[in-house]
From Swiss-Prot:
The protein, known as: Nitrosuccinic acid decarboxylase npaB
Keyword 4Fe-4S belongs to the record: no
This protein's UniProt keywords: Decarboxylase, Lyase
Superkingdom, taxonomy of origin: Eukaryota
């Protein structure tokens, strides 16, 4: 941290706001586990992600949380970061993104990221949604036909 109290106050504020947003999107359980399992080596990374991504970028005007989730899904598919895709699929559902919209984001990403990435992404997103249903975290709307 800085020796300037104003900078430290700013970091604290961004961290608090970031934790609120991160919990709203990813859930308390995940955030608590990530935060509590951070080591002295990884804690600065958790702080950076929470302050910058969640306390700043996810709070900006211009895109709502649903739009940010769809963008994030496409970007993660391009990176082939499958654990993150599962996490952000949960977040997308929490942000009101429908299964149909998630599926379409995966199909759209398949065209630009390649078939292997798209096939894996389809499996990861479907598995995640089904796990959420099994745990009672999500109820599939009847009219979706999925």
């Amino acid at each position: 941290m800085s020796t300037d109290p104003k900078i430290n106050d700013l970091h604290r504020e961004l961290l608090e706001e970031g934790l609120k947003m991160r919990r709203a999107v990813l859930g308390h359980e995940y955030v608590d586990r990530a935060w509590n399992n951070a080591t002295p080596f990884t804690r600065p990374g958790q702080q950076l992600i929470t302050e910058y991504a969640w306390g700043n970028v996810w709070q900006r005007p211009g895109l709502d949380r649903k739009q940010r989730s769809l963008l994030t899904i496409g970007i993660i598919i391009a990176q082939k970061a499958w654990l993150e895709l599962a996490l952000h699929t949960r977040g997308a559902i929490n942000n009101g993104v429908s299964e149909l919209e998630i599926r379409e984001a995966v199909l759209h990403s398949t065209v630009y990221c390649g078939t292997p990435a798209g096939v894996e992404a389809m499996m990861v997103t479907e598995k995640t949604i089904n796990e959420m249903i099994e745990r009672g975290e999500y109820k599939r709307p009847e009219e979706t036909g999925l």
